[in-house]
Amino acid sequence: MAIPAIQPYQMPTASDMPQNKVSWVPDPNRAVLLIHDMQNYFVDAFTAGASPVTELSANIRKLKNQCVQLGIPVVYTAQPGSQNPDDRALLTDFWGPGLNSGPYEEKIITELAPEDDDLVLTKWRYSAFKRTNLLEMMRKEGRDQLIITGIYAHIGCLVTACEAFMEDIKAFFVGDAVADFSLEKHQMALEYAAGRCAFTVMTDSLLDQLQNAPADVQKTSANTGKKNVFTCENIRKQIAELLQETPEDITDQEDLLDRGLDSVRIMTLVEQWRREGAEVTFVELAERPTIEEWQKLLTTRSQQVLPNADYL
């Protein structure tokens, strides 16, 4: 049940892209770049020097360079070698034992080798969210957009896009920065993503949108060290200040009304967050009075977050 050799096929072009149901726009302040399973074990199934793998690695490289320049976090997934049968579980039934314990198969391809600032997640299931802290990291950083690249398009990349959708994260599925067992499966992944859970886009178009983001948005992203102002940590600090408590004593899941956050204090937060570009209401906050829920709401409602000394 080893991965079969993949015959070359032409990487889809802009004319091959499906019609999207949504018109999402990438925001450097809200995005994370995912480089999915670009390990030697998986990449070696393609014919070296032929399409689609040549375009695949080149386009991911271009996207990564741009994301680093704009302060967008870069996340890799990589499956471990010699997995314990209990950890691998049902994957064995479909794909056999997987990678061996040798360093070559586990390694990310040289052209896309992770750098010191990149996050590498150990991958256990199709979805990059399953049994990893990707979702926790994105929420902590106040990011709700995921740029998906890598292999294989109709398996891990697509399942990750579906789970992102179910977590209210906008997935940008890059049509010529993913690859698959065949053009048919590649196109199937694009069609499903565009119609059900993601925004499909070509590399050059995505690069243009990121590059042409408003200058103040780009500056915010680069200057905040890959952070967004609407993080759980920052929200906790604001609440602690209003309650005159220590931030560490307030948890992300506790009911803030029970904690003593009254209507006057909530309206103070509403007014402050509106000034920062998040269109939220008192009723919305009162209905879901936890830091975790407020962080998700603020992230989805923020149009353009500008630096504010109150958060520093």
Curated annotation (Swiss-Prot):
Its Enzyme Commission number(s) read 3.3.2.1
List the InterPro entries: ACP-like_sf, Isochorismatase, Isochorismatase-like_dom, Isochorismatase-like_hydrls, Isochorismatase-like_sf, PP-bd_ACP
Name of the top EC class for this enzyme = hydrolase
State the pathway, as annotated in the record: Siderophore biosynthesis; bacillibactin biosynthesis
Residue ranges constituting the Carrier domain according to the UniProt record: 229-302
| CDD domains, per the entry | isochorismatase (cd01013)
Protein encoded by which gene = dhbB
Specify whether Phosphoprotein is a keyword of the entry: yes
Query: Known catalysed reaction(s)?
Result: isochorismate + H2O = (2S,3S)-2,3-dihydroxy-2,3-dihydrobenzoate + pyruvate
The protein's name in its UniProt record: Isochorismatase
Q: Which PROSITE patterns match?
A: CARRIER
Its family remark reads: Belongs to the isochorismatase family.
